[in-house]
Amino acid sequence: MNITSEELLKEARALEPQLQQWRRTLHRHPEVGFDLPHTKELVKKALTEMGYEPKDCSKAGVIALAGGKKPGKTILLRADMDALPIHEDSGEEFSSEVPGKMHGCGHDMHTAMLLGAAKLLKAHEDELEGTVKLEFQPAEEIFQGSPDMIAGGLLEDPHVDAAVMFHVLAGMPLPVGTVLVPGSGITMASCEQYHIVVKGKGGHGSTPENCIDPITAAAHIHIALQEINSRELKPGDFGVLTTGRFEAGAASNVIPDVAQMWGTIRTTDPENKTGELIRTRMTEIAQGVAAAFRCTAEVSFADYCPCMVVDKPLAENAMDYMTELLGKGAMDMTALTGGKPGGGSEDFAFVSHEVPTVSMFIAAGGPEQGCCYGQHHPKVRFDDSILYEGSAAFGWFALRWLHDNADIAF
């Protein structure tokens, strides 16, 4: 390996106009879930122009290979591509042109960063002591993209020995471009969706005595569920139960037949026993409270995503490599978290349960840059001046890790 970290960072900085163009084009045209035709077209076109042969993977993923000219390990670099089903109100001049859809989590940033890394790695392909697999993933927001691509052969042909992801952070008072490197072990919570359907008997709002009101029952269920955390979990056990959507009826003078609520369960229990307890008690409480109000309740669960597990040697590598590249711009994340897992979830966790993995974060703007809101808010903004650092970080990690592990048998 001949290139230095300073040289790679300089090359990445020269890509800034292209990185910004990719990111802002994606931002204007957000797509959600697995339905990403225009996003995939941009990614595949860019990769092809660089000299890659991109391939489809499963429902909507894209993969490409760099290196392979020298024997060695294979490292996976991943970017997610999907947006959120929310209406943008950021005020950016390149805001979403698609009503009800927005890149509010920064996946447009990730995609542009990995495309930049692809360009850097192609320029230094002869120096790669192994293979880099580039993964552009759909459907992260619904926790289905990663398991779908794994089922489609993501981690084989060639077999992946290590995996890396970066995620941008907005709205945090950190120096722009700071890379946060986590400790090892569980760093992010598991997540599971729930859906509760409460059925009663509808009728005119003036005659509640002739009805069985599902809204009243559902409201009491929502309140009762909050007692699970305080009364049923052991002190120190992490569990979050949040109802984020509640729907019932369509008119102010009509008691509906049905009320529904949707939400998430998050835990940091690797065996998910805490999650099992919460699910069991949710079902019992919902059905019991509903019965008290002469209603019935159906409770279902879906889209489970496990905890993120960070490999200790990779986390140590990450701190070393990011310090080489960015100096004081690399920060030990445990200084902020106290070593405790975060409550957010990420479907790259599925990969972390299959191969050694590290997930890092990049500060992409705080209040000083006008980025006052966090992810998933309609007003969130991201400072795309950090894109080149993200590309360099992806590229430098791959170059260094393959070099360091060229002669190591796993």
What annotation goes with each model-predicted range?
Residues 2-103, 108, 112-129:
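Acidic/His- and Gly-rich active-site-bordering loop/insert found
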Residues 2, 6-9, 13-20, 33, ...:
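Electropositive phosphate-/nucleotide-binding environments in soluble metabolic enzymes
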Residues 26, 77, 107, 134, ...:
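Divalent metal-coordination and catalytic microenvironments
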Residues 219-410:
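Metal-dependent amide/peptide-bond hydrolase catalytic core
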Residues 84-86, 91-102, 108-109, 121-256, ...:
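Histidine/acidic-residue-rich, glycine-tolerant segments that coordinate divalent metal ions
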Residues 76-78, 87, 194-196, 359-364:
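Non-cysteine beta-strand/loop elements that form the S-adenosyl-L-methionine
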Residues 73-76, 132-133, 160-164, 330-331, ...:
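Structural motif
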